[in-house]
């Protein structure tokens, strides 16, 4: 078993859900991958903010450098959203040799070229499948499995939150109720 200390950039709806899901599925993840992922630090703007799912003691920090400069942190999941200061944080992490996973559509769309170039230069990975189609491995299939095929276009709603809300509405739920349910489950902010 390989221990993988993980840091989160953000601990709101999505960050706390990531922490909870990693904790709930630790044994399954370890069995499938041989890796034990555990959240050891989470960057937040306000330590005093009430959180519906508080993390373990000592996990929350307002000090970005404590994540960037900690050699024991093997992976960072960016779940803050937005461009600033998120983009700067991700660039610094990549330059520091830390692999980053991001669910941030806006960041990838706007800053992706620079981020991917920086990751390549640093010899680390920037993974972003969590930002596409509720983390269904669409990007992996397009990049790896269909490497000998030219894909000209992909059409559809490839956003898990939207798909969830539309499915609930198709089942008779009102938009506001479907959105509230998605937020409660950690799918939407």
Show which residues each predicted segment covers.
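Short acidic, glycine/serine/threonine-rich loops at helix termini
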Residues: 19-20, 52-55, 112-115, 137-144, ...
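Short, hinge-like loop/turn segments at secondary-structure boundaries
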Residues: 58-59, 118-121, 144-147, 172
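Conserved anion/nucleotide-ligand pocket segment
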Residues: 144-189
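Rossmann-fold NAD(P)-binding glycine/threonine-rich loop
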Residues: 80, 85-95, 103-144
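N-terminal glycine-/serine-/threonine-rich beta1-alpha1-beta2 phosphate-ribose binding loop
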Residues: 1-96
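Residue-level detector of anion-binding/catalytic polar loops
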Residues: 99, 125, 188
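General beta-strand structural signal in soluble alpha/beta enzymes
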Residues: 60-61, 78, 101-103, 126-130, ...
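Conserved active-site and cofactor/substrate-binding residues in soluble primary-metabolism enzymes
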Residues: 9, 13, 17, 62, ...
């Amino acid at each position: 078993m390989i221990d993988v200390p993980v840091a989160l950039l953000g601990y709101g709806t999505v960050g706390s859900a990531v922490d909870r899901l990693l904790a709930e599925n630790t044994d399954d993840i370890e069995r499938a991958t041989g890796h034990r992922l555990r959240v050891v630090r989470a960057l937040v703007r306000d330590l005093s903010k009430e959180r519906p799912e508080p993390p373990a003691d000592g996990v929350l920090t307002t000090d970005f450098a404590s994540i960037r400069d900690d050699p024991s942190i093997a992976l960072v999941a960016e779940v803050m959203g937005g461009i600033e200061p998120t983009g700067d944080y991700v660039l610094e992490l990549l330059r520091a040799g830390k692999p980053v996973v991001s669910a941030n559509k806006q960041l990838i769309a706007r800053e992706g070229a620079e981020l991917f170039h920086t990751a390549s230069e640093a010899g680390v990975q920037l993974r972003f499948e969590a930002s596409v189609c509720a983390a269904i491995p669409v990007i992996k299939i397009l990049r790896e499995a269909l490497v000998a095929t030219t894909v000209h276009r992909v059409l559809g709603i490839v956003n898990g939150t939207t798909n969830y809300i539309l499915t609930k509405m198709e089942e008779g739920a009102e938009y506001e109720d479907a959105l509230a349910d998605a937020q409660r489950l950690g799918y939407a902010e």
